[in-house]
Structure formats: C-alpha cells, structure tokens
C-alpha cells in the first residue's frame, strides 16, 4: 500500500510544480479556511481509530486533515506576514500571526491528537527568524525546564530540611532568570545585581539557618522574595516608565503561576496515557510492559544494531514485532537495528543536508512570502526529526509524530509532499520575477 502512496505523492508533486506559483499566494487564505473546516468536521467524526478522532474515512480511504493543515497554516501565515505594512513588533500583528497558528491547534486537540497539535509550535521558530523577540523562545524553554524539574524532583528534599528540591530549584531559577532579563533587556546592571544579590543571599542564609538552627520549609522565604521582586519591578515600571520592566514582571508572575499549576495540569488536564508517558520519561515510573514498552524495545533494537547493523530485514527486534509501531512512529529504530550506527548517522546527515538546503533556498527568496513559507517548512521538518528521533531514543515524550518521508502512512507522506513541493514551486518562480 505504501507503494501506492509513494506513486500518488509523485503525481501530486508533479501537479504542484505545474501550477503557477502565484496560485499559492492568491488562494492561501481559502486553502487555510478549507482545512480548518475539515479539522472542525473531523472532531465530530464517529470513526475513532486508536483512540483518536483525527481521521476522515471516505470508503477505503482514510486521511488525517491535521497533516494537511500544516502546509495550509504555513501558506496563511506567509500570506499575512507578506502583506504591506505588516510589522511583527506590533502587538496587533503579532496576535494575528499567533491566531493563525493556534486555531488549528485547538481543533486538533479536540480530536484527541495532542502530539500533532504540538507540531504547530514549530512555527514560532519562523517568527523568531522574522523578528520576534528571543524572549518568547526563552520563556517557552524556561517553562519546559520548570515543568521537568518541578515534577521530577518534587519528592526529594534538601538535606534534612522539609524543602522540596524541585520547588527550591525552580523558584531560585525564576529569581536568576528575572535578574538576567533585567540586565539584558533593560540594560540596568544595578537593578539586576540588586535583585540577584538579595534573592540569592537571603536564600542561602535561610538554607543555612534551616539546616543548622531551626528546620523549616524555605520555599516560603523564596515566595516572599519573589513577591518582593515583583513589587520592586512594578515600582520600576511606575517610576521609570520603561515597559520592559512590565514584561519582565509578567514573566516572573507567569513563571510562578505556571510552576504551581504544572502538577494540576499533569494530574487533571492530561490524558492518563499522556501522564504515564511523562512519568516514565522522567523516571518517576517503570512501566516496561505498558507505556514504556515501545521506547524500551526501540532502545534495545537500536543498541543491538551496533556499528554496522544486522543487515537489511535481519533485525530480530523489528522482524519479530517486538516494536509495535516500527513502521510508523518508531521506524528510526528499524534503521538503527538493521543498518547500525553508520546507517542511523547517514539518515540524520541526510536530514541535516535537507535542513541546511532549506535555509539556503529560503534566504534567497526575493519576496517575503517565499522566505516565510520556506522557514515554515524548515521549522516543521526540524521539529519532526528532532522529536521523532528523540522519542525513539527515550529523550523526548512519545507524542506520535512521523519521521518525514520514512514513516508508513499516506496522510503524512502527502502532507510532507505538499509542504516541500509548494516551496520548490515558489522557489522556481523567483527566476521569473527577476527576469
């Protein structure tokens, strides 16, 4: 069946290349609206496959609109950002770009496909290339760090003090990160040193007092320090009228709020299978026969491949079906077992070459539409490769996204074909523009 999908993908690629490159610019919003309609309709689809309502069943044909919504979203946001007068530094324009990204994510989450929805965060890499402040990416990374450390080390305590290592570490990081942001974005080294000095100094003093004098939970001291830090930043906002202080204050408040809501999200918002996967990834649970089975078997398969592998179709772990999803989400473990380190490295080098080529082609576009779309394609490919390989190696959560052009499945193959070949057609049209 995969041969059929490959053949139809070649035909699709040919059709895409035959269309005028201006077609994709002209009908970007229409394509986006059509895919949003399909995503919305899929939520009410009675056909549930593997616990997901993300499939449209048309007779013998089964398609996932979420895979096609990626290129539609890329076209729509490229159209928006290439309009005259668009300025990403303006909040109204930035909010419009975010809305285009978030809207399909909402519909996809409604289909119980959280993993596919997370792919759309990759578009923020494109926004960063087009001028979005790096503080947004920093905030996202910081929240991930808070979540991991706060959940992973919630139980262990510091020495004999009734203080959680996770809570202590996260609140200390909030104080340090806030000081660093004041230094970098406000160019105010004195305020940064004041915040850092008081917070770290009092925290260390409280730690020593609790260890050698009276044991107590020093998290309360840290919370008081964070409140004082926020109050001081508010004073700077009112006194100096510098808006950067306001955003840094929001970062501090948001960090604390996010951290204390992480446990609630894990236990009450996430689905049971998602919660177990995260606990297994963080080492809080050992479920080798359940949620951790695929990852454990894929690690065995890759490790057993050695340097040169066992040979094509000679993998024992994959051939004997120890890895259930070896043709789709975990196909990289098949490469690792059969072709070894050499084959795995070769595949990763091919993806690296593709990503570097996409950067080169995107940068040479004469119009903003082509450049933005190119970086959308690049971001999606980068996210898929990083997360897919990471989850096979047990480094990232298992969220069920395919490896581009490797994993079995027609929807993903068609989706990546649309993504890449539309960009090739846009690039081919640049020479016509220059002549």
Where are these regions (language model features)?
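Glycine-rich, flexible loop/turn motifs
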Residues: 45, 52, 59, 274-277, ...
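Glycine/serine-rich anion-binding loops at beta->alpha junctions
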Residues: 60-69, 111-112, 306, 398-417
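Transmembrane helix boundary and interhelical junction motifs in multipass membrane proteins
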Residues: 113-118, 309-315, 326-328, 399, ...
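Transmembrane alpha-helices of multi-pass inner-membrane enzymes
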Residues: 177-181, 394-431, 435
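Long extracytoplasmic/lumenal interhelical loops at the membrane interface
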Residues: 299-302, 306-339
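Membrane-interacting alpha-helical segments
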Residues: 304, 368-373, 428-432
